[in-house]
Regions:
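Reductase modules of NAD(P)H-dependent flavoproteins
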Residues: 1-30, 72-228
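Helix-loop boundary elements of multi-pass alpha-helical membrane proteins
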Residues: 28-34, 63
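Beta1/beta-strand and adjacent pyrophosphate-binding region of the FAD-binding site
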Residues: 35-42
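Generic hydrophobic alpha-helical scaffold/packing signal
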Residues: 38, 50-53, 57, 108, ...
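Classical protein tyrosine phosphatase
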Residues: 42-68, 80-92
Length: 228
């Protein structure tokens, strides 16, 4: 009938709203466009930066050459760091205890070793990666027996040449970061960056994000937050 056809035509002409969302890019994609990046993760918030560090380490390894005669290590690129804009990475991970670090420590150990090889064969190069780990469950004033924990960690590092908690060359800090000291150190001392060069990327709890955002504003660092 005409009425049936009319209703069918009206349904066909009716506009159906369509909403298209995403994909949304991550702020981490800007990392390689920066000169000096500070990657900060709170707990599992470090996950977005694991792949970045893994990729950077792969670039070092891809250009590594081992001599068949003497097993000496060299790199095919004159300067890996000169070939890209990114010159320096500070990796900061704030976590409750050592157990939460275990899954990622192997990658950090490998990167430390790769950097040592690279610096040994390129004496004029500067350190590319600095690692800063924080255990928040342990306090500065804690003792092992009657001996201060801080003293034990220092002696162990001197004797063993590695951190007592992680076996990394980088020192593990106990307690929460003192952000004024951390950020102040980025723009002071030898080979320091300028505030304009420092870009801070963070992923973690919102309360921690606000604290870091405020300090970035004070030091005039660019701040990027990955949704936790």
């Amino acid at each position: 009938s005409e009425s049936t056809i009319s209703r069918t035509q009206m349904k066909m002409k009716k506009r159906v709203p369509i909403v298209i969302n995403g994909p949304y890019s991550s702020c981490a994609r800007y990392v390689l466009d920066c000169k000096h990046v500070v990657l900060i993760g709170g707990g599992i918030g470090i996950t977005p930066y694991a792949s970045i560090l893994s990729s950077l380490m792969a670039q070092f390894r891809a250009s590594r050459v081992v001599c068949k005669h003497c097993n000496g290590i060299n790199y095919t690129s004159k300067s890996l760091v000169e070939c890209r804009r990114l010159k320096k990475v500070d990796f900061i991970w704030v976590n409750r205890d050592q157990k939460n670090f275990e899954w990622f420590l192997n990658l950090l150990r490998q990167f430390e070793q790769e950097q040592e090889y690279y610096l040994a064969s390129n004496e004029n190069e500067k350190r590319f990666l600095d690692i800063h780990l924080y255990f928040t469950e342990i306090k500065h004033e804690e003792n092992i027996g009657n001996v201060p924990l801080d003293l034990i960690t220092k002696i162990w590092a001197q004797v063993a040449g590695e951190d007592i908690f992680t076996s990394l060359k980088s020192k593990t800090h106990v307690g929460r970061p003192k952000w004024d000291e951390v950020f102040g150190g980025l723009i002071s001392g030898e080979n320091a960056s300028t505030a304009n060069d420092v870009n801070v990327f963070f992923c973690g709890p919102s309360t921690m994000a606000q604290t870091i955002r405020n300090h970035c504003a004070t030091y005039r660092f660019r701040f990027y937050e990955e949704k936790f």
